[in-house]
Amino acid sequence: MKLINGLIFRRIALFCFVLSLSLSLYSRTGGNMSSAENKKSRYKIAACDWMILKRQKIGSFQLVRELNGDGVEVDMGGLGNRDSFDNKLRQVHFQKLFKEEAAKYNLEIPSIAMSGFYSQSFVKRANYKELTQDCIQTMIAMGAKIAFLPLGVECDLTKNPEIRSELVNRLKVVGNMAQEAGVVIGIETSLDAKGDIKLLKEINSPAIKIYYNFQNPLVAGRNLYKELKKLGKNRICQIHCTDTDDVLLQYNKRLNMNKVKETLDKMGWGGWLVVERSRDKNDPRNVKMNFGMNINYLKQIFQNETF
């Protein structure tokens, strides 16, 4: 009976999402009005291409347009044990193709992600400068101003404090590279706000900022809203505005998105909110339901859209 009820709920949720999206698109003129409005919006909503199962795939733009997003955070491609990212955007042909597709669907590319460093160690890679330069060149080619660099499992400073000196030195180096290129590298850490501020002071680079992820303080039991205020608007370059995979954002009882907006408004922060997770644990691969409903929920709160 529970299984049947779960299936019925997911079908109803998907139907409601499709209906709301259809009504939303009906009220627009080919998406052009939405694009013009969103360029003026203080907050814009994007999705990670690797989480919608479209890592460096041209189809990510059409899909995000269908999901009602404003942009796509494009990944550098897989890393694993390779010497370099599996990055097709080194080629001018693909750069042109991706930019044309983004323009076709009135979407932006706010950031380029090095998600490979979730599992790979930034402090153990001898060629970290080459990997970072590859990302910076891709950013310039695609018109993105922010890079996402997660300090993942092996660079977790709370569990591996002994790597701190080497990590800081490397971030100083890539910070200089980013500053020269006129871009920003956003780092995701497991530290609290006080720890992030201390780390940024040690790095001492205007081109290294915090790419904040709501999931980290929520999992650790910290006060998300107080942390945002403590960090302040100038230290946060971009936000992954989701929690772990369990329930959709609108059903998440430990994440009050209205309070998040109120906090960010008072801080004077504005920018891109990127949907990474918060998928329904019972149907995690249902991209259209999970990301569509989460994006629409965020648009209701941050862009005052109604569906």
Predicted region positions:
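Bacterial N-terminal signal peptides that target proteins for export
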Residues: 2-13
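Bacterial N-terminal signal peptides
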Residues: 13-24
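Active-site acidic/histidine proton-transfer and metal-coordination neighborhood
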Residues: 22, 101-105, 118-210, 218-219, ...
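Histidine-acidic metal/acid-base catalytic patches
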Residues: 28-46, 51-70, 105, 193-307
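Conserved beta-strand positions in the central sheet of alpha/beta enzyme cores
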Residues: 73, 111-113, 148, 186, ...
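Glycine-rich, proline-tolerant flexible connector loops at the mouths of alpha/beta enzymes
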Residues: 75-99, 151-159
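A short acidic, helix-capping loop that chelates divalent metal ions and anchors anionic groups
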Residues: 80-85, 118-122, 155-160, 219-221, ...
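Charged helix-capping and loop-helix junction motifs
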Residues: 88-95, 125-133, 161-171, 223-229, ...
